[in-house]
């Protein structure tokens, strides 16, 4: 029996979570999220090791074992909170892979390659998920929908993770790329922001939009950029894989 067909680009949406969270909902959200985060972090470690830094390798972090990368809050609590709050998308993070950038061959360019490894891996996973849509119609009906929902969420989660991480704010990957490519006169002031990077993100993603809403202003600019960029990349991947 033929199962569900792969979606056209116009119908592609992450699986919405209903009021009552079920094991099915968890299985189609948590599995692709853990895979996306695990491969993202492992990729940093693999590239760092290839470029001369053995820190992650010695600590056992160059691994595709999710248990090596799980952060209790970022990988478990935060996604669960988003699920329970019926967020339109699921997001999370893992423990950052430790990298000694001074040990890399060609330190600044090496930092760029290590940083790009995570988002590039997520885009590759998203491309594989989109390509796999074509296989769903050949699966038994009782498993096709589950596989399709996992693939749809894998596509969205991986692209979102890649796009968000490329924001040029340290310690995000985009911030590392900027530090490696900018002239030192610009890179040094940006590097000084790293200890406050997460606070800056919370400010521009949550506090600034909330403050703007009090005055009738839409200041949620970064979320709009991430959302629009994510949609564009998803559409591009669907075209590339013949799903448009």
Residue ranges and their predicted role:
Residues 2-244:
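Hydrophobic transmembrane alpha-helices and their immediate loop junctions
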């Amino acid at each position: 029996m033929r199962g569900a067909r792969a979606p056209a680009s116009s119908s592609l949406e992450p699986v919405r979570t209903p009021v009552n969270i079920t094991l099915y909902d968890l299985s189609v959200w948590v599995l692709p999220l853990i895979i996306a985060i695990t491969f993202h972090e492992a990729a940093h470690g693999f590239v760092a090791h290839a470029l001369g830094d053995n820190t992650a390798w010695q600590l056992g972090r160059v691994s595709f074992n999710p248990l090596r990368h799980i952060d209790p809050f970022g990988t478990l609590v935060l996604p669960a909170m988003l699920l329970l709050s019926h967020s339109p998308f699921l997001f999370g993070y893992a423990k950052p892979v430790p990298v000694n950038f001074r040990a890399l061959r060609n330190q600044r360019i090496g930092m760029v390659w290590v940083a790009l490894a995570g988002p590039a891996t997520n885009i590759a996973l998203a491309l594989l998920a989109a390509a796999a849509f074509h296989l769903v119609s050949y699966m038994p009906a009782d498993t096709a929908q589950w596989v399709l929902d996992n693939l749809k969420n894998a596509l969205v989660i991986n692209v979102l993770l890649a796009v968000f991480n490329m924001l040029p704010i340290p310690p995000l990957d985009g911030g590392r790329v900027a530090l490696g490519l900018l002239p030192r006169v610009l890179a040094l002031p940006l590097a000084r922001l790293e200890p406050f990077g997460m606070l800056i993100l919370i400010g521009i993603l949550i506090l600034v939009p909330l403050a703007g809403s009090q005055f009738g202003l839409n200041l949620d600019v970064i979320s709009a950029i991430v959302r629009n960029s994510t949609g564009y990349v998803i559409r591009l991947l669907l075209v590339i894989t013949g799903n448009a």
